[in-house]
From Swiss-Prot:
Entry protein name: Alginate lyase
Keywords of this entry: Lyase, Periplasm, Signal
Family indicated by similarity: Belongs to the polysaccharide lyase 5 family.
Its job: Catalyzes the depolymerization of alginate by cleaving the beta-1,4 glycosidic bond between two adjacent sugar residues via a beta-elimination mechanism. Degrades deacetylated polymannuronate alginate more efficiently than non-deacetylated polyM. Is able to degrade its own alginate, but at a lower efficiency than that produced from M.pyriferia and P.aeruginosa. May serve to degrade mislocalized alginate that is trapped in the periplasmic space.
Record's keyword annotation contains Transferase: no
Catalysed reactions listed for this entry: Eliminative cleavage of alginate to give oligosaccharides with 4-deoxy-alpha-L-erythro-hex-4-enuronosyl groups at their non-reducing ends and beta-D-mannuronate at their reducing end
A Pfam family it matches: Alginate_lyase
GO BP terms in the entry: alginic acid catabolic process
Family matches, as CDD domains: AlgLyase
GO MF annotations in UniProt: poly(beta-D-mannuronate) lyase activity
Organism for this UniProt entry: Azotobacter chroococcum mcd 1
Residues binding substrate: 61-62, 134-135, 252
Length: 372
């Protein structure tokens, strides 16, 4: 008798996977098709489902009280922000962690396992409040990218781990689509002076949702936002709106790269090559950031302040190197450096980025890197 596979807890109620996609269907990069590693053994304990967040998306900014550079952390405001957004970050991290664990150590079905994390949030239309501030709409788009990004690994796996859940499928897809539509409303038609890394992360989240639900309008919107971002990269590889962050300008240039690289990788998988936009803006931006890590003086000159390098000492901040080296011919030295820094796990990109783009890299335990 053939044993049937299913998710342990978490996404026991996700989308029905299909092994066959129509020619026009949106697809992710090839690493998302990886099969499960099936090992018999004791199943992981179920994680408690965070209460679906259906309230107003109005949160204090951790930079509250800072000047226009928005670069000075307000510890009291940050504490309040972390406390109020805890259910959202818990589901982001929880889904990412469990998907990584499941893909790496697929377990046989444990009898009686209840439906998992996302179904409850979809059922309650979580994260869809139209009452929000800037920090609130930022949380919405980050969460969508995290959840849809992790889900993609399950949907497109050749092992089809979600095939047992057709009823929940419609609910989850509809929810992703609705949140994606709202993110588009949140971040469309902004003046250029307000388009920065937040818009890039919004575009990544919509790209992930678009491919997860096979909705071309979401894909197209994400690509259009990439075009806008590419036009913002100057001839030397600087982003004017990130230079405004003064002492954190280099850190925010680096923070802009993960969503842009992911969008480019997903576009490439669907026959759209974005590397040539604005005379190779994406590669130029990446090269400038890598040079800045070695010598931050050019950033200090342009931003008007010495650069705070603390964020850049965290290897997880360079998770964009995985899609970068899949899109470009990275030098042997950079590939060696990437291997030393990795494996990269970033829950805001859906989890284990290395396993997707460089699967021969030796995997490590399923911890989720910091993303903010």
């Amino acid at each position: 008798m053939k044993t049937r596979l299913a998710l342990p807890c978490l996404l026991g109620s996700l989308l029905l996977s299909s092994a066959v996609h129509a020619a026009s269907a949106l697809v992710p990069p090839k690493g998302y098709y990886a099969a499960l590693e099936i090992r018999k053994g004791e199943a992981q304990a179920c994680q408690a489902v965070p209460e679906p967040y259906t309230g107003e998306l109005v949160f204090r900014s951790k930079y509250e009280g800072s000047d226009s550079a928005r670069s000075t952390l307000n510890k009291k405001a940050e504490k309040a922000f972390r406390a109020k957004t805890k259910p959202i970050t818990e589901i982001e991290r929880g889904v990412s962690r469990m998907v990584m664990r499941y893909m790496e150590k697929g377990r046989l079905r444990r009898a009686g396992m209840r439906p998992g994390l996302l179904d409850a949030w979809a059922e309650d239309d979580a994260l869809l409040s139209t009452e929000y501030n800037h920090t609130g709409k930022s949380m919405r788009k980050w969460a969508l990218g995290s959840l849809a990004g992790a889900y993609l690994r399950l949907k497109f796996s050749t092992s089809q781990p979600l095939a047992a859940y057709p009823e929940q499928a419609k609910r989850i897809e509809a929810w992703f689509a609705k949140v994606g539509d709202q993110v588009i409303k949140d971040w469309s038609d902004l003046p250029l002076k307000q388009i920065n890394n937040h818009s890039y992360w919004a575009a990544w989240s919509v790209m992930a949702a678009g491919v997860a639900t096979n909705r071309r309008p979401l894909f197209d919107w994400a690509v259009e936002q990439f075009h806008i971002a590419a036009k913002q990269v100057d001839p030397r590889g600087f982003l004017a709106n990130e230079l405004k962050r003064r002492q954190r300008a280099l850190a925010y240039h680096n923070y802009s790269l993960p969503p842009l690289m992911m969008i480019a990788a997903f576009a490439q998988a669907n026959g759209v090559d974005l590397r040539g936009d604005n005379d190779g803006a994406l590669g130029r931006l990446a090269g400038n950031v890598l040079a800045g890590v070695e010598d931050p003086e050019p950033f200090a000159e342009r931003a008007g302040e010495d650069q705070d390098m603390e964020d850049l000492e965290t290897d997880a901040k360079f998770s964009w190197l995985e899609p970068y080296c899949a899109l470009y011919a990275c030098s042997p030295a950079l590939r060696e450096r990437k291997a030393e820094m990795g494996p990269f796990k970033n829950f805001r990109l859906g989890g284990d980025v290395t396993r997707i783009f460089d699967p021969q890299e030796k995997p490590s335990k399923s911890t989720v890197g910091n993303a903010d």
